[in-house]
Amino acid sequence: MHVDTPQSCCRFAIAHGDITPPADIYHRMWGAAKHDRATGIHQPLRATVILLAPAEGDERQFIIALDHCVMGRREMDNLLEVVSKGTGIAHADCIVVFSHTHAAGLMGLERADLPGGDLIAPYLEDLSKRVVELLSLIHI
């Protein structure tokens, strides 16, 4: 007896790069932390971007994976806007996921007045630009 096994083909691309924030950025992530600013870099943070598309056709889905814990709505909207303007990729074609590491700190723009918080907005701008660079490497 012959059993047909469903198979599919797709196009796949992946790129990754460093997104480590500056060592003295505001870092307090949870209540037990004993300091506000990061005192160094233990391990670098990474962004990974993935493209999934059918073997034929124009449909595309992009996955943006960031070594961060979470991102607020305002920060997410800013990221997706920069990505859309920089690549032409629609917001609806992007899924952003997080590794959920508490080592990255909480990069909320509302923390700008805290020690090292002045580095958050420039870091998030650089992060968005880095994601655009990575997406441009896999845009097929």
What do these predicted regions represent?
Residues 1-97, 101-138:
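Conserved beta-alpha junction segments in alpha/beta enzyme cores
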